[in-house]
């Protein structure tokens, strides 16, 4: 039911496989921007390592090949733990832009980082200009 509704809203087929994801930028015009939100610790790790074992990671890889922006909206309980190194790698990766993020519960979950999803649209606007919306570190 959800997939049917998504197709109705977008007018496009839902991308469900890695093979489908590979074809998106090869058939016609490439996407202007790809938004991955929420970007979990697992997604960040795989992207930082160059893995493309899911449709969304393959889409990101295709975007990088076409020099197009990828916007990430972090949502991970381990952002200031083991995932911090992956965030660091991605912060310095060409064509990766972050929705500003911060600690959502510094005392209850001190390693948790979550994007300010209310800043998604301004982040996309800046990413299309090849700029990172600042400040990238925000107080929640």
For each of these PLM feature ranges, what is it?
Residues 1-54, 61-70, 77-140:
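A cross-family phosphate/adenosyl-ligand binding-site feature
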């Amino acid at each position: 039911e959800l997939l049917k509704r998504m197709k109705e809203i977008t007018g496009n087929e839902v991308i469900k496989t890695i093979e489908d994801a590979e074809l998106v930028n090869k058939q016609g015009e490439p996407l202007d921007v790809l938004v991955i939100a929420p970007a979990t610790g697992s997604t960040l790790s795989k992207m930082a390592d160059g893995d493309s074992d899911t449709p969304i990671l393959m889409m990101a890889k295709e975007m990088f090949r076409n020099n197009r922006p990828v916007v990430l909206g972090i949502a991970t309980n381990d952002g200031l733990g083991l995932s911090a190194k992956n965030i660091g790698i991605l912060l310095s990766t060409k064509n990766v832009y972050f929705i500003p993020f911060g600690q959502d519960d510094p005392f209850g979950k001190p390693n948790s980082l979550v994007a300010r999803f209310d800043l998604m649209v301004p982040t996309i606007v800046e990413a299309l200009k090849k700029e990172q919306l600042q400040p990238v570190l925000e107080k929640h």
